[in-house]
UniProtKB/Swiss-Prot annotation:
Keywords: Bacterial flagellum. NCBIfam families: FlgB. This is Flagellar basal body rod protein FlgB. It comes from Cereibacter sphaeroides (strain ATCC 17029 / ATH 2.4.9). InterPro entries: Flagellar_basal_body_rod_CS, FlgB.
Length: 128
């Protein structure tokens, strides 16, 4: 028998990661005028794979390198700007706003899918 968490699938993990990404993006936007501030983000796909247990790399030969670096540890990465600012700030407002809007839309979609999944489970529990 599978647990309740297993029934929610990847949607619950996606929701948490979307919230984390949203916090990073809003921090970037809030610090757009802060000198030497470095814009940060996460690799959502890699983080979701890691959170769902699919993120471990399989080594098929002894000479393979182990995965490493900030992305492998689940840390926020620094974003490289297309056109860097003279004050050292790497926030590009248009990029941040676009990423924020897309992430918000995907957050709402994940929430709707999770709500539907929970409604389906409640219907099954009630026997309707």
């Amino acid at each position: 028998m599978t647990g309740f968490r297993d029934q929610l699938g990847v949607h619950a993990q996606a929701l948490v990661l979307r919230e984390t990404r949203n916090n990073l993006l809003t921090s970037n936007i809030a610090n757009a005028a802060t000198p030497h501030y470095k814009a940060r983000d996460i690799d959502f796909g890699a983080e979701l794979a890691r959170a769902s247990g699919n993120g471990t790399l399989r080594t098929t030969e002894a000479r393979h390198f182990a995965a490493g670096g900030p992305a492998a540890r689940g840390e926020a990465l620094y974003r490289d700007p297309v056109s860097p600012s003279l004050d050292g700030n790497t926030v590009e407002m248009a990029v941040e706003q676009m990423e924020f809007a897309e992430n918000t839309l995907r957050y709402q979609t994940s929430l709707a899918l999770l709500n539907r999944r929970i409604s389906g489970l409640m219907t099954a529990i009630k026997g309707e």
